[in-house]
Amino acid sequence: MIDINAWLEFFCGRLDENFPGLVWFLGLQGSYARGEAKDSSDIDIVVIFDRLTMNDLQRYREMLDGLPEREKICGFVSGRDELMHWETSDLFQFCRDTLPIRGSLAEVLALVSDEAVKRAVLSGACNVYHACVHNFLHERDADILAGLYKSAAFVIQAEYFMNTGQYVKRHCELAGLVSQEEREILRPDSGLGFDELSGKLFAWAGRRLTE
């Protein structure tokens, strides 16, 4: 598995060489940030520039193309002003799931109200429900389904925060705090087939919308 600390040190060096003094915030998301990474895990990097242009994006892409593990690098890139005007229901998960490396997202998180968290839960459940139905009927893609289970995990995180005021970042820890139904979403049974896994996700998302 990737030595993420060594990789980040190299990444930061290249970022400083290419964009000296231009990065407002740098962070890590996803399984590496949660300490739950596997060999197949992506490297989810968050880079917020003071100001972002298409020329900056071109230069950043060229920088990424010269990095090790290029095929695993993904993440979020934005200008600071654009992020400060983002839909606040999206900012809840974005801020809570990001491990800061340089800078702070406190200014961004302060924009997120209780109502925004409720919207995050509702819109997340709506998106999972619709995509689950579409995938079951048309695509029938196991990778899409796996991605929807990940999306559902974020909804469960947000709902748990909404109910308790506590944000539990590690999914393995959250699984011990929620209902059996939610636990089966956080830890889907690898022995189940596509249809049964789709059915469990469909039922969970439907209940989130109607209860």
Task: Give residue spans per PLM region.
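Short, glycine- and small/hydrophobic-rich beta-strand elements in well-ordered beta-sheets
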Residues: G21-Q29
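Catalytic core of pol beta-like nucleotidyltransferases
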Residues: M1-E17, G21, A33-D39, D50-E211
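N-terminal loops that bind phosphate or other acidic moieties
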Residues: D44
